[in-house]
């Protein structure tokens, strides 16, 4: 009989989808196991016959499914306003590029967000965060990018820090100052990039407000040369990087980000084979964002078969934002990734667990159920992981465990 230490907590009579690639079964499934949690981490996974049947800190889950906590590795959670009117314009024939050129798009949200009080932004973002938590999300990336000036970018990152301080969910904050050219720099995008590189990145990094730097390399964002200035600045300071690339056209953004060993290249609908090879060589995760693909009614699919062939890890995220993916649901993103992009349900699960963890640089601690990893997991009223992907309108979450505590 396995001896437990005071303070140990056990979840027994469970079916574990460990998402551990070292296990041979699909989803890393193992039956009739018990999960021992100690000091917020998984201490061990053992056959349940090695443990007492009952006790003060022993939870009998009656055969329920347990998975790692979900990870949403790409969101724009902190913003004010909405862009419903733009959506109607697009449905009446206007393109995303045309709307952006007329001062809409990202800059419309920038105006609303700059004018919004920090406490109001916090309350709006907190409600969105808790919606994701209710689906089993335990680690969440939050980008800035709706300030496009030092003061408001800092305000957005402070909101992310305040959300993290609640200890309800892990937050990975990302500086996305190179999201768009603000109206006041419309005729001088290079000047804005200078502001980002010489002021925003170093000052906000010194304050410890973000974990990584992101950028938007696209015809409606920044060109390759401007994007590289951002990457060079970040890497000179030792900051991990990532990029929104190849969403609407092929500019070579994936190759650029991979050359700087980027954590991830996101969107990637127009990614070509050279870009896929560069991602493999750079250790860069491909992040699929099917919500934006759906909402913009795009037709160019990301090259899933090429990503498989080159063994590039593929993550899936909600891309929750007011303009192009107003879907605060990782379950829906998983379903869309399967239906629209052809992922298997197991690939979708890997995309919101171990590969999403890698996209945030957390692969050594998050995204799998194995000894030494964080005790962030979800108990589901389900028999198979596919059920969560198959029916996104139904949430079979039974229990969410964060840092070893039922939350």
Curated annotation (Swiss-Prot):
Major location category of this protein: cytoplasm
Gene Ontology CC terms, in alphabetical order: cytoplasm
Pathway the protein contributes to: Amino-acid degradation; L-histidine degradation into L-glutamate; N-formimidoyl-L-glutamate from L-histidine: step 3/3
Cofactor: Zn(2+); Fe(3+)
Enzyme class name: hydrolase
UniProt-annotated binding residues for Zn(2+): 74, 76, 244, 319
Coiled-coil spans in chain: none
Annotated positions binding Fe(3+): 74, 76, 244, 319
Cofactor: binding comment: Binds 1 zinc or iron ion per subunit.
Binding site for 4-imidazolone-5-propanoate: 83, 146, 179, 247, 324
Location(s), subcellular: Cytoplasm
Catalytic activity: 4-imidazolone-5-propanoate + H2O = N-formimidoyl-L-glutamate
Record's function text: Catalyzes the hydrolytic cleavage of the carbon-nitrogen bond in imidazolone-5-propanoate to yield N-formimidoyl-L-glutamate. It is the third step in the universal histidine degradation pathway.
Protein name, as recorded: Imidazolonepropionase
Encoding gene, per UniProt annotation: hutI
């Amino acid at each position: 009989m396995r001896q437990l230490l005071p303070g140990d907590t056990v979840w027994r009579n469970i079916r574990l989808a460990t998402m551990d690639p070292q296990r041979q079964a699909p989803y890393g499934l193992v039956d009739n196991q018990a999960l021992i949690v100690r000091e917020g981490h998984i201490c061990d996974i053992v056959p349940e016959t090695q443990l007492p049947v009952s006790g003060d800190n022993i939870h009998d889950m009656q055969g329920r499914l347990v998975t790692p906590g979900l990870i949403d590795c790409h969101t724009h959670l902190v913003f004010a306003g909405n862009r419903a009117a733009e959506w109607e314009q697009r449905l009446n024939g206007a393109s995303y590029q045309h709307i952006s050129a007329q001062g809409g798009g990202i800059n419309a949200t920038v105006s609303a967000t700059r004018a919004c009080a920090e406490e109001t932004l916090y309350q709006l973002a907190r409600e969105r965060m808790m919606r994701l938590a209710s689906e089993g999300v335990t680690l969440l990336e939050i980008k800035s990018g709706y300030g496009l000036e030092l003061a408001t970018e800092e305000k957005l990152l402070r909101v992310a820090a305040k959300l993290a301080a609640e200890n309800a969910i892990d937050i990975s904050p990302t500086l996305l100052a190179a999201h768009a050219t603000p109206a006041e720099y419309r005729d001088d995008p290079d000047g804005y990039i200078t502001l980002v590189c010489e002021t925003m990145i170093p000052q906000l990094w010194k304050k410890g407000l973000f974990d990584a730097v992101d950028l938007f390399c696209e015809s409606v964002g920044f060109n390759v040369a401007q994007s590289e200035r951002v990457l060079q600045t970040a890497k000179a300071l030792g900051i991990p990087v990532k990029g929104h690339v190849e969403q609407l056209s092929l500019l070579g953004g994936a190759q650029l980000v991979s050359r700087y060993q980027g954590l991830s290249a996101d969107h990637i609908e127009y990614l070509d084979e050279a870009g896929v090879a560069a991602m493999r060589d750079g250790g860069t995760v491909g992040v699929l964002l099917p919500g934006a693909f759906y909402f913009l009614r795009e037709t160019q699919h990301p090259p899933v078969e090429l990503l498989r062939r080159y063994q590039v890890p593929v993550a899936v995220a909600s891309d929750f934002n007011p303009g192009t993916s107003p879907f605060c649901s990782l379950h829906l993103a998983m379903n869309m990734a399967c239906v629209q992009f052809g992922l298997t349900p197991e690939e979708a699960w890997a995309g919101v667990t171990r590969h999403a963890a890698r996209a945030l640089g957390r692969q050594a601690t998050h995204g799998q159920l194995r000894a030494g990893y964080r005790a962030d997991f979800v108990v589901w009223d389900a028999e198979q992981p596919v059920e969560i992907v198959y029916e996104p309108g139904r949430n079979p979450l039974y229990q969410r465990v964060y840092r070893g505590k039922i939350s």
